[in-house]
Amino acid sequence: MKFSELWLREWVNPAIDSDALANQITMAGLEVDGVEPVAGSFHGVVVGEVVECAQHPNADKLRVTKVNVGGDRLLDIVCGAPNCRQGLRVAVATIGAVLPGDFKIKAAKLRGEPSEGMLCSFSELGISDDHSGIIELPADAPIGTDIREYLKLDDNTIEISVTPNRADCLGIIGVARDVAVLNQLPLVEPEIVPVGATIDDTLPITVEAPEACPRYLGRVVKGINVKAPTPLWMKEKLRRCGIRSIDAVVDVTNYVLLELGQPMHAFDKDRIEGGIVVRMAKEGETLVLLDGTEAKLNADTLVIADHNKALAMGGIFGGEHSGVNDETQNVLLECAFFSPLSITGRARRHGLHTDASHRYERGVDPALQHKAMERATRLLIDICGGEAGPVIDITNEATLPKRATITLRRSKLDRLIGHHIADEQVTDILRRLGCEVTEGKDEWQAVAPSWRFDMEIEEDLVEEVARVYGYNNIPDEPVQASLIMGTHREADLSLKRVKTLLNDKGYQEVITYSFVDPKVQQMIHPGVEALLLPSPISVEMSAMRLSLWTGLLATVVYNQNRQQNRVRIFESGLRFVPDTQAPLGIRQDLMLAGVICGNRYEEHWNLAKETVDFYDLKGDLESVLDLTGKLNEVEFRAEANPALHPGQSAAIYLKGERIGFVGVVHPELERKLDLNGRTLVFELEWNKLADRVVPQAREISRFPANRRDIAVVVAENVPAADILSECKKVGVNQVVGVNLFDVYRGKGVAEGYKSLAISLILQDTSRTLEEEEIAATVAKCVEALKERFQASLRD
């Protein structure tokens, strides 16, 4: 935002120079991007009056004038400007004047006629780029007055970056409030006297979208002269704020916009049919904008319409069919509060970014509309004449923003600032900021001013107090903090340790999105309800994941499509499972999952190309589980999972509780996901593994170990893991090792049965076992297997 320093000083005039003022504004949070003089460096230019103006005898495009500059005689000056005429008050550079660019004015002859000065344009004085003619001053401009003094050109344009939370500073009044607070000065607001209605003319106004437009004010002004010139003082203020003068009506609404931060619009009343209706656009409805372009509107766009057509995009841009033109005599002034959410994004959708939409998107003071309407009415009547009707106010109090009531605690204030500010000073700062303050014991109750949308929570008040108090006034103090040593249990298994193990085994860690494609997720978890996002980034990212497999398998496909056929990846992260018993109805579990596919080894001349299988992944998984010290308590059980191959998968159980799955991706799912070749996955509930068994030191036996091998025939559906577990249980005191070293099916073994060759390692820590003891233990194991599994020794 750009504004004139002198305009700001009309509201509040601290006794500091321009540099100090700019620095103060920056430190208040409104970063100053630049300070530039409003005019070039010149002197010797005064107000003059063209007393005579005649055609140059030797040049068609030149005129010979006599100009009164308040001296003893009239000056002869040759001028080429087309708007030079008798009686005009002008800016005259007299002999000896120096204009921008070190251009010195001297007496000269132009085509034989003497010239004792120069009638200046705005561009020649470095005020603007306008070189279409000489400056036309008001008829009451005092002759002989220095033009710098008359036009107040010893001024600067200050440009600031206004952050989105400080929409109140998109008007002079907002910046002035901050400067007044920082310098403990009163705010001198211009006197705005309500304009009484002198006519009864009104237009019916209906608001059909109160959520988008909680307040709408309209006022008819009849009999205006739209061709009346905008006063030079107003043109100059607009120019110094970067706004080009258009006509008196538009200039008035722009002036109020810059002064108060309230956008306004003027409709040609005679082109409105019936009355005003504030509604949402009809899908596909069109509107020809003021710049001549046609906009196709969506149903979520707010429009100002009459009883037959849309007239304007509410809070964004006016329409051509209701705009003010040279023939306009009667206008309807609009001043409204539009909800920021109803404006946000609508302008960009049509390639627009207007001063009005910029302010409405960030928030306009909902208590400002009556003041702005009265200000605009007075300025319009003073410049263009006319008579005003009554103000029609349609307000829906239920949808207007409510002023936040915030409690500021002394303890919170001191802790966040790190410095004690006296109670009286805190109260004074909050009141000067516009808050209604009630003091309590070690706290303040503050009602935020209507123009501060960013004051919502306690931290906002802490920030405001620190900002106004002055960050430079807060002394530097060394941080005093007690160091609390984190507790570390030896039984805690670090997830980082597991990640390192997987890295060592050739896996790479990936991070995928927590929100996934619900269609793909349903393929992996059919029939399981997932949490759907109300405002997703896209349809493909609209559901919270039920497992890490969805993202991991998508990553595999992505890599395979880029000629990466050997993939080993893992991920740790949360899954989100709907659960009515959990807080907020969602259970978040930390999971560890991985995927492998492709060749078992990297390509090598001495290694055969072998594709990974179930046992490759199971072996890697057992290495992970071994870190917990509970591998002997882990069971792999055949259990159905719709995402996995029914004959090459298993559920993982720890002490009878399921903690995950491992297996080959189901062939049908592989086809649907476009996976290239056999793909294997695993997933574990990490929280059920993080508590590891601390290794216990035990005596190493000095006595020899004995191995005995047995081959038992069992039914095909008996898991080998159950056989090994039973052997360990029976020989708990002497059997120190059990291993499956062969599985046989075929000749000598009946159909539907298998032969398991098992090695038993027997050892005692106190003595050498006798053969009879060994035989008895082996027999005991065989007997237990017969009893539980109907196993028989193979002949």
UniProtKB/Swiss-Prot annotation:
Residues 701-794 form the FDX-ACB domain. InterPro entries: aa-tRNA-synth_II/BPL/LPL, B3/B4_tRNA-bd, DNA-bd_dom_put_sf, Fdx_antiC-bd, Fdx_antiC-bd_sf, NA-bd_OB-fold, Phe-tRNA-ligase_IIc_bsu, Phe-tRNA-ligase_IIc_bsu_bact. GO terms for biological process: phenylalanyl-tRNA aminoacylation. Its EC number is 6.1.1.20. Keywords: Aminoacyl-tRNA synthetase, ATP-binding, Cytoplasm, Ligase, Magnesium, Metal-binding, Nucleotide-binding, Protein biosynthesis, RNA-binding, tRNA-binding. The keyword Protein biosynthesis applies. Its main location: cytoplasm. GO terms for molecular function: ATP binding; magnesium ion binding; phenylalanine-tRNA ligase activity; tRNA binding. CDD domains: PheRS_beta_core (cd00769), tRNA_bind_bactPheRS (cd02796). It is found in: Cytoplasm. The keyword Ligase applies. Residues 401-476 form the B5 domain. Binds 2 magnesium ions per tetramer. Tetramer of two alpha and two beta subunits. NCBIfam families: pheT_bact, YtpR. This is Phenylalanine--tRNA ligase beta subunit. It comes from Shigella sonnei (strain Ss046).
